[in-house]
Amino acid sequence: MGSDLNITKQLQDYILKYGLKLHPIQKEIINHNLSLGDIKRMQISISQCQFLHLIIKVSKIRKVLEIGTFTGLSTLSMSLALPDEGEIIALDKDKKTNKIAINFFKKANQNHKIKTIIKPALESLIKIRNEKFDLVFI
């Protein structure tokens, strides 16, 4: 999982016990990623999922740009916090992991909020340079 800044085991346990509960598909993504070996380090942590969710809710964010989707845990975490008319543009160059992510988005009924672009980020950023976003997550 992604690295946490000074989050002790005790604090992590507290967050898991009393924090936002994970959606079943978030849990499914985490379990899927456990089978991927060392590359699973590209996944964000559960506390980071919860932090993103909180920031999006309290800031009333509507449009997000994500650079690097992997198997979709961060994307789904943000999408679940967005209003129904919210939107995420998720950029990634890996067709294989993108396909996995899209399947998870569909299972969670969030695919209507998420547009994925499979190209190197620089190419995609040039194409969408005139769009405005409330949050950019890298």
Predicted regions and their residues:
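A short alpha-helical cap/connector motif
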Residues: M1-L135
